[in-house]
Amino acid sequence: MLLEEILKQEQERFIKENLLSDEMLELLKENIMPFNTLMAYYRCAIMEVETKFKVLNEEFSLQYDRNPIESIKSRIKSMDGIFKKAKKKNIPITMEGIEEGIRDIAGVRVICSFPEDIYMLADCLLKQDDVVLVERKDYIKNPKPSGYRSLHLIIEIPIFLQNEKKMMKVEVQFRTIAMDFWASVEHKAVSYTHLRAHETRGN
């Protein structure tokens, strides 16, 4: 997909958004093209990471007649989500502040069959000479109190533009199918609790 097409898609996404605060709308009004471009760069970074895992999966299929990856999911944090996180962490509401201060704008989730595949794939990814590890959090060996388990990596990878190379951060989450199911149930439970609390306050 061409960068121009990605920019157009992001612009349409901005137009459809209607739940932003006045402060966020003012930021976008002043920085709409830089923000669009930044989001497009994150989408490009996601494509790079997805390609790396697809290549690894294909290699294992050819050499060992099995696929360690069950599925690959990706997402870009919403504008409202970016803004709320910036406010919560006192990150400057600027393009530079957002890019430097929020590490999980771009996310890729790799669902594996077995726990050992998680560490094997993480090692394969980090051995690649264009991948830089920024942060590692192992919630498999050290689960959260809720029971949530996953391996989180923040990495930097290059995207190659027309006239430059730009390093972009991507959060990569590794889970088994069972871990992903538990995370989904936990997320729904938290969302339901927040909704009930809001309804109670409203009454």
What does each of the following model-derived ranges do?
Residues 119, 131-156:
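Beta-rich nucleic-acid/ligand-interaction surfaces
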Residues 121-126:
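Short amphipathic alpha-helices in soluble, non-transmembrane regions
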Residues 114-117:
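Helix N-cap motif at beta-to-alpha junctions
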Residues 106-112, 172:
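Short cationic amphipathic helices and targeting signals
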Residues 158-189:
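Conserved, surface-exposed functional patches that form binding/active-site neighborhoods
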Residues 1-100:
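Charge-rich, low-complexity segments
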Residues 103-105, 148-150, 165-169:
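Short connector loops at helix/strand junctions that flank enzyme active sites
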Residues 193-202:
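Conserved small/polar residues in nucleotide/adenosyl-binding loops
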